[in-house]
């Protein structure tokens, strides 16, 4: 489960940083 949430959270963070 975490394996799927990790990339999702990373993508959201990258979007915020961008």
Swiss-Prot record:
Protein keywords: Amidation, Amphibian defense peptide, Antibiotic, Antimicrobial, Cytolysis, Fungicide, Hemolysis, Secreted
Modification sites for Lysine amide: 18
GO biological process: defense response to bacterium; defense response to fungus; killing of cells of another organism
Secretion signal span: none
Annotated disulfide bonds: none
Free-text tissue specificity from the UniProt record: Expressed by the skin glands.
Keyword Oxidoreductase: no
Tree of life domain: Eukaryota
Subcellular location per the Swiss-Prot or TrEMBL entry: Secreted
GO cellular component, one term: extracellular region
Protein purpose: Has antibacterial activity against the Gram-positive bacteria S.aureus ATCC 25926 (MIC=8 uM), E.faecalis ATCC 29212 (MIC=16 uM), and B.subtilis ATCC 19659 (MIC=8 uM). Has a less potent antibacterial activity against the Gram-negative bacteria E.coli ATCC 25922 (MIC=32 uM), and P.aeruginosa ATCC 27853 (MIC=64 uM). Has antifungal activity against C.albicans ATCC 90028 (MIC=16.7 uM), C.krusei ATCC 6258 (MIC=16.7 uM), C.parapsilosis ATCC 22019 (MIC=67 uM), and C.neoformans ATCC 90012 (MIC=33.5 uM). Has hemolytic activity against human erythrocytes (HC50=18 uM).
Protein name: Hylin-a1
Organism (species): Boana albopunctata
């Amino acid at each position: 489960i975490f394996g799927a949430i990790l990339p999702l959270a990373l993508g959201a963070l990258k979007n915020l940083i961008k």
